[in-house]
Amino acid sequence: MNFRVSCLILSCLLALSSCAAQGEELSPAPVAATPSAAAATPSPTPTPTPTPTPVITQAQLDQAVAQAGSDHGAMAVQAAVIRDGEVVLESAWGWAVRDSVAMTPQHKLRCASLTKVAVGLSAALLLDQGLIDPEANLSTYWGSTVCNPYYPDDPVTIDTLLTHTSSLSDSSSLSALKGSAARQRLAGSGFQSLRPGDPASWGYNNYGFSVLGMTLELAAQQPLDQVLGEGLLEPMGIDAAFEGGSVTHTELLAPLYQGGSVSRSVSEMLGYVCNPTPGYRGNFFAGGFTCSAGELAKLAALLSADGVYEGEALLSPEAVAYLETPMETPITYRDSTFYQCRPLRYQEGMYGREGLYYHTGSAYGFYGLLSYDPETGDGVVVFTNGAEGSTDAYGVYAICGEIAQAVYNPA
């Protein structure tokens, strides 16, 4: 659902309703048509048939995945294509375990910042359940003071965390990721001299999503794995978790590679499991979500279909529209300009399309892309392992962008 197009349609409908009402007041009594009047009546113009969106084939996808993997020195690539609210194609290339286990569409990777989309979907579920107010001060959920001392009258909210405008200082310290430490930082010590919620305060913030995940857990009084699992993952047949060791089929976990060497081993991932205490820690909400490209594509398909998957409404259209709603001021970051949504991004003119919603992710040699076209409902999710990390003109990792170009504009 394109937020701006929806607003335009609503305005047009209101205008048409107004015109219709005025027409009823001013219309004269009906007059019988004369032969000359009937002859002057123009014939209705046929509605033009829209040009069909080009569709990539399995063979073309396999070729694009293999070519991109080779072009960018990857250890492995997965890709999944969305069409009409469903995942219709999947492809895999390379090694899940170097020189011994071939990558398959079923293997699971830690998908870095694509995790933030999963956190956003968790927020959408709680929004539908009436358990959160995105505009309420975080103190509502933490039960203690949350205040930026530089701007005490501007609340720090779930919405500011989703849009990277919370004004919290980013932190990679493991100790800062504990709920007790986050509570202290939220009381005042963890903020920058930036106005919460102001687009000028935008700064990509992993720590903010750690705090967001803990906040959602406190609101639900459940671990986020349970919130997302019961609300979406289980109904959609997705075996995924915010911690690698919490997936059911751990035999499908694949190590991450960077520079030809293992950067995150399976044994390390197995040590990360869900903590049952809500708000205890936020270690995995910025980048720990673990799944296959096809499984994440199911979640992207849900968004592209306004919350419906295989005929079942799992999210309200209003909750999806909230995630897709852009801030008014565009953001320029790493040589690309986009509209920050919640937490999706929207960029016009990507890969030959009018515009795409998307998110990228990178860590430990993983480079990924989630994207979909709100006008056509098609999209693509790409996971890569061990590739070089150059970016294209849209700020997307070039290996992912090469596959996206092939999907959105197949020859």
Regions found by a protein language model. Name each.
Residues 17-18:
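C-terminal motif of bacterial Sec signal peptides marking the signal peptidase cleavage site
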Residues 21-55:
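Ser/Thr-rich, Proline-interspersed low-complexity disordered segments
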Residues 56-109, 131, 191:
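Short, conserved catalytic-motif segment at the N-terminal edge
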Residues 65, 79, 85, 108-135, ...:
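Active-site SXXK
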Residues 133-150, 235-236:
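Short, glycine/proline-biased beta-turn/loop segments that scaffold the active-site neighborhood
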Residues 150-362:
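Short, surface-exposed loop or secondary-structure junction motifs
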Residues 367-387:
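Short, well-ordered beta-strand elements
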Residues 387-411:
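Short, gly/Ser/Thr-rich active-site loops of penicillin-recognizing serine hydrolases
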